[in-house]
Amino acid sequence: MAMAVLQDARFRQLVQNTPVITLIGSRNMWINAQEVVKRELAAAGAKLMGNVPYVDRGNNLVSAFTILHWMLTGKKTKKWGIFPIPGVSAKDIEQAKNHGQLCVESLEKNQLASFQEELISRKWIQLPVTILFIEKRAKRLFQIWANLITNKEKKGGNRRFWVNLYKYYLIIALFLISPIVLTIYFIFVFPFSMKKIEQERYYYSNILERKHG
């Protein structure tokens, strides 16, 4: 839906030379999508001044289970009375008014350029290392599977079979493979890469343009 709007000629004309603040609502993965949104807004001539993500802050595996419960039942409740309530927490929803107030103050003081930095300094935007690690690799894996399914279909393969295979792969990857990979990562890689990781967390938490070359 967001991409459809961003491609609309009337919308692109509307945001040209216009300050824009993006709001995100997701389970926990949003950085790849936001990179696309940033590029589209820049292409439209918009001035991205801020980005506020609202996510499920629960454990990745737990939130996958609770979100599934919410999707299949339509009930945003504690599964079996023991799991956390799925989705964006009531506390974060309540906190949204503070984000709005900060935006108003920034506009009134003509300091909208510092809006995002203020959000970060107040620790209102948090990007867990686990999510950063998973999402960066998930994009590559998705592209591999997308190309595989497309190529198999072009050669007369059964698309439904390969899509179902991908579905089961996702379940195995989420609940079996990722915990093992993350454990290895935090033991052997993370301690020696903290500076680079912090730079990446700052980049994705901010509204910076990726430098090329």
What are these regions (language model features)?
Residues 1-48, 52:
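Helix-loop-strand module that forms the ligand-binding subsite of alpha/beta enzymes
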Residues 28, 54, 166-169, 185, ...:
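Sequence-level detector for tyrosine residue identity
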Residues 28-32, 57-62:
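Short, well-ordered, mixed-charge alpha-helical segments that flank or form enzyme active sites
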Residues 38, 55, 114, 194, ...:
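Residue-level signal for alpha-helical context at structural boundaries
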Residues 58-150:
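A conserved mid-domain beta-alpha-beta active-site/ligand-binding segment of alpha/beta enzyme cores
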Residues 149-159:
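Cytosolic-side membrane-insertion boundary helix
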Residues 157-197:
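A transmembrane-helix-recognition feature enriched in membrane-embedded lipid enzymes
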Residues 189-213:
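Membrane-proximal, acidic/low-complexity disordered segments on the non-cytosolic side
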